[in-house]
């Protein structure tokens, strides 16, 4: 990881104070997160998780409310133990594909359908021809009634890149273990459903994978104003709390293992749908990346550089170009969903994928990197803990905090644009 303390000190004089304030915001978010885990807790009925965490002496379960509470010391201990680097880490702005969109885009199809095995084979060949810009991948698209292990073996034909699977969808212990000890495979597991509610079957898979020694990517995707508060800071707190909970479980099982931070919060439209075309989607994920690069020091993978467009048209291409530029100009560690996905991750398109890859080559070829660290001007929210304490694992959409902050993400993106820090 870069020396971000040094980078802040070396930053342009007119950026320095804003960057110092931004780092203080991330430190406060991390502190608030530990308070959320200690006082609000995580909803769960998973006996293995409860037994595992209570055995540390730093967590306690309250059966009357069905929540487990973690002391800050357990989070500190887990972060201290966790790996901060991994084999194959290519550093900042490593982009890839992932998320397993449910449908393959086919022009003229009346009804959307997943891919066939033959189509997946073809897509993996296409990805293999673009590994100069696509440096990691999970399955590009769902296969109709596909066996996860068979899909993984198709992906395993690719060398010189990191492949990502989800062992939670595999049957049997051997299926989980087949990639154990391999540096070129990571296991992406979402063990917490936002907001702050343990998915017990997924946590069983996380524990099994940690015991097998797999490299983990701990993922969660809170929706601002729906399953998380409608402000950037409070939304990040929910995201951070969910990943820190999974981290505590994994590090208790297997101290020192790789646990990439995969918290990928999402902006939403007033109708509740995802909004991957919004500039704040990319800014929000840059902020989460910085929280980890600057404070926790965990390797991180974010989301962005995508689109809500439903077909691979000029708008879809422009959204991807703009989003990837925001991610890379401000700087992330890893980011997925960056190539070929449409309609807020519902579709994967070969046409869009090839256009996105070529556009990224042109960006890299023409980029003039002055090396300056640029502030995000992340807005603060002094009610972040209060709203999470009040709503906990219920619906944030009906809370007054959401109503009072409906324009928070629009205002943030406009403020950054007004400072000339977003693409024209």
Task: Kindly label every feature range from the protein language model.
Residues 2-10, 17-32, 40, 45-52, ...:
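Catalytic-core signal marking the mid-to-C-terminal active-site face
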Residues 8-13, 54-61, 223, 265-269, ...:
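Short acidic (Asp/Glu) and glycine-rich catalytic loops that position anionic groups and cofactors
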Residues 25-29, 34, 91-110, 294-307:
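N-terminal small/glycine-rich loop or linker at the start of catalytic domains
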Residues 43-50, 63-65, 254-261, 295-303, ...:
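Flexible, glycine/charged-enriched surface loops at secondary-structure junctions
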Residues 48-111:
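Glycine-rich, N-terminal phosphate-binding loop and its surrounding beta-alpha-beta segment
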Residues 111-333:
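Helix-rich catalytic cores of soluble enzyme domains
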Residues 285, 289-291, 295-394:
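Hydrophobic alpha-helical bundle architecture
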């Amino acid at each position: 990881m870069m020396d971000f303390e040094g980078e802040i000190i070396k930053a342009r004089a007119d950026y320095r104070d804003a960057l110092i304030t931004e780092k203080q915001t991330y430190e406060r978010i991390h502190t608030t997160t530990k308070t959320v885990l200690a006082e609000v807790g995580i909803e769960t009925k998973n006996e293995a998780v409860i037994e595992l965490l209570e055995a540390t002496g730093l967590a306690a379960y309250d059966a009357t409310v069905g929540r487990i509470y973690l002391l800050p010391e357990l989070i500190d201990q887990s972060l201290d133990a966790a790996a901060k680097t991994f084999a194959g880490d290519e550093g900042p702005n490593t982009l890839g594909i992932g998320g397993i969109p449910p449908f393959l885009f086919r022009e003229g199809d009346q009804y959307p359908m997943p891919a066939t095995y033959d189509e997946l084979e073809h897509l993996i060949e296409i990805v293999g021809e673009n590994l100069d810009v696509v440096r990691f991948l999970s399955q590009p698209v769902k296969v109709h009634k596909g066996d996860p292990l068979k899909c993984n073996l198709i992906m395993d034909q690719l060398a010189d890149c990191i492949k990502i699977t989800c062992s939670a969808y595999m049957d049997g212990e051997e299926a989980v273990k087949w990639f154990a000890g391999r540096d070129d495979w990571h296991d992406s597991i979402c063990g917490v459903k936002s907001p702050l509610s343990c998915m017990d079957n997924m946590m069983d898979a996380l524990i099994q994978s940690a015991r097998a020694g797999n490299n983990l990517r701990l993922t969660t995707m809170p929706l601002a104003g729906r399953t998380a508060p409608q402000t950037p800071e409070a939304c990040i707190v929910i995201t951070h709390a969910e990943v820190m909970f999974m981290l505590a479980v994994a590090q208790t099982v297997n101290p020192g293992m790789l646990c990439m931070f995969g918290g990928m919060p999402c902006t939403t439209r007033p109708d509740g749908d995802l909004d991957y075309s919004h500039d704040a989607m990319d800014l929000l994920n840059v902020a989460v990346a910085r929280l980890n690069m600057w404070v926790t020091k965990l390797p991180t993978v974010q989301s962005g550089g995508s689109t809500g467009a439903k077909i691979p048209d000029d708008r879809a291409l422009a959204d991807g170009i703009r989003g990837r530029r925001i991610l890379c100009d401000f700087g992330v560690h890893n980011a997925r969903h960056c190539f070929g996905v449409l309609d807020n991750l519902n579709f994967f398109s070969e046409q869009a994928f090839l256009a996105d890859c070529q556009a990224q080559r042109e960006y890299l070829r023409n980029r003039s990197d002055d090396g300056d660290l640029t502030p995000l001007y992340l807005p603060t929210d002094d009610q972040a803990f209060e709203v999470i304490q009040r709503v906990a694992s219920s619906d944030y959409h009906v809370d007054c905090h959401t109503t009072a902050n409906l324009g928070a993400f629009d205002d943030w993106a406009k403020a950054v644009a007004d400072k000339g820090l977003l693409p024209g």
